[in-house]
UniProtKB/Swiss-Prot annotation:
Species the sequence originates in: Streptococcus agalactiae serotype Ia (strain ATCC 27591 / A909 / CDC SS700)
Entry's EC annotation: 6.1.1.7
Binding site for Zn(2+): 567, 571, 669, 673
Enzyme class name: ligase
Lineage: Bacteria, Bacillati, Bacillota, Bacilli, Lactobacillales
Record SUPFAM superfamilies: Class II aaRS and biotin synthetases, Putative anticodon-binding domain of alanyl-tRNA synthetase (AlaRS), ThrRS/AlaRS common domain, Translation proteins
Record note on cofactor: Binds 1 zinc ion per subunit.
Function: Catalyzes the attachment of alanine to tRNA(Ala) in a two-step reaction: alanine is first activated by ATP to form Ala-AMP and then transferred to the acceptor end of tRNA(Ala). Also edits incorrectly charged Ser-tRNA(Ala) and Gly-tRNA(Ala) via its editing domain.
PROSITE patterns reported for this sequence: AA_TRNA_LIGASE_II_ALA
SMART domains: tRNA_SAD
Record key words, sorted: Aminoacyl-tRNA synthetase, ATP-binding, Cytoplasm, Ligase, Metal-binding, Nucleotide-binding, Protein biosynthesis, RNA-binding, tRNA-binding, Zinc
Name of the protein in question: Alanine--tRNA ligase
GO MF: alanine-tRNA ligase activity; aminoacyl-tRNA deacylase activity; ATP binding; catalytic activity, acting on a protein; transferase activity; tRNA binding; zinc ion binding
Length: 872
């Protein structure tokens, strides 16, 4: 077996499959594009779903890739085991309706065992297979595999929901008896026992059925096109080929671990307690790549995942004695390890470091808040006479504040409290079940559509035409091909068309189809790409249409022009964002409609009003600069040399279109555009908002809609000016400010009057002092205008030694407001109010010294006041 670096393994994999006629699919962005079922790209096949479900036919049915992936449903196991990772690299080879079982197995065995390639010893390889899949068993035998090395496993059948499914055969490497201390042998495989002896290095999925959850597996229908989907973990291959005990001792992780040794002053011991080193090395890889791909830490979705990873890594850094910010210092090492195939980490190093460091600094403040929350929980336990910290509270510390259970346990036990481990495990399992359910839900490939996949007739989109005559070559009605149609809705393919199919954020053209008499026979309401790339026109049929007949196709020119204004403005906006807020502001989605444009981009905070003003100004300057717009067809490399930006998530063929707007913007784009920037007329941003962690959205309008937006603003300003009696529009702001200042003065005067009234009333309230359980207390109903007055009472009470506890109740409108304040450690205001509030059909809470509640039953106020003594 050859001893290869991880980079050599990856390259040899790709080279082998290229020698078998495969095209190399570049690694896709970790943030899924147009796939709401996935939080992350989590496998090599995840980016190829459109090929497997038949919605798109690839140029080459043989594909290979090395795909960066993230899975986070078992984060807590990372660092504890030899092979759990959040980010990993999946090597794959795929056949879309081309070769099948025989070639997949034969070529896989060749790659693994040939001296020209990996040169694995054949006697160290074991294969599992689905018991009913005798064809795979026989093919392995034909390759020279001993029958004793073939293990039938009932679970070797791959299916996730509806869509492509089939048996799979897995390949394992035997590391020998040293990793099997109990000498269990092949039972480890046959009974699926977790072990370190037999390492799964490759899984070959034979996708031959359309799974249907409504019928038994034996009744699944054969796919119209059988597929091969395989996955081999680079980290596992590297561990085996480099003789490493775990994946972490390979060249993918050890350089990071060495840097952590320098930062901590601790030494990594492969046989000792090294969990913290592993966690940090794993998590900083995931963070570096995910942030580089546009995801940012936040409180929801993938942003929450990144925040959790970073906080877990920071806490493990503290366990190693690293108390300052340090993770960001590891980003260059991650980039250097992966540079040969993933240069983007080093290219975006400054931005990634900035985000990681800022998040570390934020977490340092969060740790203080978490410690305060734990202190509050322990104080509450003491007040309630309890000795165990509940599992749900431990989980909240873990989930919300990033506190490892070990830290919570240590601090709680130092204060002589026990830990509810079972309750914590239950809360953790509930979260994991939700996560796994979401993963399963999102895994379906979708059913193949044989009718659409069967369209092979050629069709060409004419960029320069808004009307042309073309021959109708395909009609599909009710999901069946037909020669003619006279009513209802149908899908049409023409030899040539002026209708743009929705793509790259630009909506489809609308229009009409006319016969040779000039009569409209169909209305085009949508155009999408067929699996083989042809524009597929969705039409409402008004009169007879037949295959082989010529028709005149006319787009709605006014709609197209409006869409082109917005699309061209989108390119200008993208460039302006780069110039104003930074090159990290890359496209994360766009929509160019007739009435508006919508542009999503990566950014870690709201765009300020001043920045929006600069962006809007810059876009309009380019419109007024009368810039010529040109399109050029070339190859991807030449386009990039021209400075063209490749848009987020798009896949490009051998020939690409470059859209250049003067010297200001150069992008790869397949859409339609204006001839000159001045045709846009005017550009106005109408909204900027966050749509998720690290993603912002700008909605803007152009041309007539931009003019109307400005006119609406002017009308609103005129109305405001009239309301505040400003003599001219320019005076409106000053008049509004003057009114605001006057209102503030009146409000201040009102507060002062209320405080004086409350102070006067307090004299009577504070006279009625009672005592119970050795605690002096005041309990009274007061007549106030709002809940704020209750707090004013409490502030006055705190300034003098009237009593230890104050309870005030007020009926305000239809609501009952309750306040409890305490000066003594013997009475916890927050706990006390939880006992009182239900009496008036309310609830509330608060801190040890002050708490408030709201209720709805004013008839029970006297009962509440009478219950104060027993609730002390």
């Amino acid at each position: 077996m050859k001893e290869l670096s991880s980079a050599q393994i990856r390259q040899m994999w790709l080279d082998f499959w290229k020698s078998k006629g495969h095209s190399v699919e570049p690694s896709a962005n970790l943030v899924p594009v147009n796939d709401p079922t996935l939080l992350w790209i989590n496998s090599g096949v995840a980016t190829l779903k459109k090929y497997f479900d038949g919605s798109v036919i690839p140029e080459n049915p043989r594909i290979t890739n090395a795909q960066k992936s993230i899975r986070t449903n078992d984060i807590e196991n990372v660092g504890k085991t030899a092979r759990h990772h959040t980010m990993f690299e999946m090597l794959g080879n795929f056949s879309i309706g081309d070769y099948f079982r025989d070639e997949a197995i034969e070529w896989g065995f060749e790659l693994l065992t040939s001296p020209e390639w990996f040169d694995f010893p054949k006697d160290k390889l074991y294969m599992t297979y689905y018991p009913d899949d005798k064809d795979s068993y026989n093919r392995w035998i034909a390759c020279g595999v001993e029958p004793s090395h073939l293990v039938p496993i009932e679970d070797n059948f791959w299916e996730i929901g509806a869509g492509p499914s089939g048996p799979d055969t897995e390949i394992f490497f035997d590391r020998g008896e040293d990793f099997d201390p109990e000498n269990i042998g092949l039972r480890l495989l046959a009974e699926d026992i977790e072990n370190d002896r037999y390492i799964e290095i490759w899984n070959i999925v034979l996708s031959q059925f359309n799974a249907d959850p409504a019928v038994p597996r034996s009744e699944y229908k054969e796919l119209p096109n059988k597929n091969i989907d395989t996955g081999a973990g680079l980290e596992r291959l590297a561990a085996v080929m480099q003789g490493a005990k775990t994946n972490f001792e390979t060249d993918l992780f050890m350089p990071i671990i060495r840097e952590v040794e320098k930062l901590s002053g601790k030494t990594y011991d492969p046989d000792g307690d090294n969990m913290s080193f592993k966690v940090i090395a794993d998590h900083i890889r995931a963070l570096s790549f995910a942030i580089g791909d546009g995801a940012l830490p936040g409180n929801e979705g993938r942003g929450y995942v990144l925040r959790r990873l970073l906080r877990r890594a920071v806490m493990h850094g503290r366990r190693l004695g690293i108390n300052e910010t340090f993770l960001y210092k590891l980003v260059p090492t991650v980039g250097q390890i992966m540079e040969s195939y993933y240069p983007e980490v080093l290219e975006k190093r400054d931005f990634i470091e900035k985000i990681v460091k800022r998040e570390e600094e934020t977490f340092a403040r969060t740790i203080d808040a978490g410690s305060g929350h734990l202190d509050s929980l322990l104080a509450q336990l003491k007040a309630e006479g309890k000795d165990t910290l509940e599992g749900k509270d431990i989980f909240k510390l873990y989930d919300t504040y990033g506190f490892p259970v070990e830290l919570t346990e240590e601090l709680a036990e130092d204060a002589d409290y026990k830990i509810d481990h079972e309750g914590f495990k239950a809360a953790m399992k509930e979260q994991q079940d939700r996560a796994r359910a979401a993963v399963v839900k999102g895994g379906s490939m979708g059913m193949q559509n044989e009718t659409l996949a069967g369209i092979v007739e050629e069709s060409r989109f004419d960029y320069g035409a808004d009307s042309l005559e073309s021959n109708l070559s395909v009609i599909i009605a009710d999901n069946e091909r037909t020669e003619a149609v006279s009513e209802g809705q149908a899908l049409l393919v023409f030899a040539q068309t002026p209708f743009y199919a929705e793509m790259g954020g630009q909506v489809a053209d609308h229009g009409v189809i006319k016969n040779d008499k000039g009569d409209t026979v169909a209305e085009v309401v949508d155009v999408q790409k067929a699996p083989n790339g042809q524009p597929l026109h969705t039409v409402n049929v008004l009169a007879s249409l037949s295959v082989g007949t010529n028709y005149t196709l006319e787009i709605n020119k006014e709609r197209r022009l409006a869409v082109e204004k917005n699309h061209t403005a989108t390119h200008l906006l993208h460039a302006a964002l780069h110039n104003v807020i930074g090159e990290h502001a890359t496209q994360a989605g766009s929509l160019n409609e007739e009435e508006f444009l919508r542009f999503d981009f990566t950014h870690f905070e709201a765009v300020s009003n001043e920045e929006l003003r600069h962006i809007e100004q810059e876009v309009n300057e380019q419109i007024w600069n009368d810039l010529t717009i040109t399109t050029t067809e070339t190859d991807v490399e030449t386009a990039k040399e021209m400075g063209a930006m490749a848009l987020f998530g798009e896949k490009y063929g051998k020939v690409v279109r470059v859209v250049q707007i003067g010297n200001y913007s150069v992008e790869l784009c397949g859409g339609t555009h204006l001839n000159n920037s001045s045709e846009i007329g005017l550009f106005k941003i109408v909204k900027e908002e966050g749509i998720g962690s690290g993603t912002r959205r700008i909605i803007a309008v152009t041309g007539r809609q931009a003019f109307e937006a400005y006119r609406n603003q002017e009308d609103a300003l005129k109305e405001i000016a009239a309301t505040v009696k400003a003599p001219q529009l320019k005076d409106a702001a000053a008049k509004v400010q003057a009114l605001s200042d006057s209102l503030r003065d009146l409000q201040k005067e009102n507060v002062e009057l209320k405080e004086k009234a409350a102070a006067a009333a307090a004299g009577d309230v504070f006279k009625d002092i009672q005592e119970a359980k050795g605690v002096r207390f005041i309990a009274s109903q007061v007549d106030v205008a709002d809940a704020g007055a209750l707090r004013t009472f409490a502030d006055n009470w705190k300034q003098k030694d009237y009593s230890d506890v104050l309870v005030l109740v007020a009926a305000i409108g239809e609501k009952v407001n309750v306040l409890v304040a305490s000066k003594t450690k013997d009475v916890h205001a927050g706990n006390m109010i939880k006992g009182l509030a239900p009496i008036v059909a309310g609830r509330g809470g608060g801190k040890p010294d002050m708490a408030m509640a709201g209720g709805s039953d004013a008839s029970k106020i006297a009962e509440l006041l009478a219950a104060v003594a027993e609730n002390l």
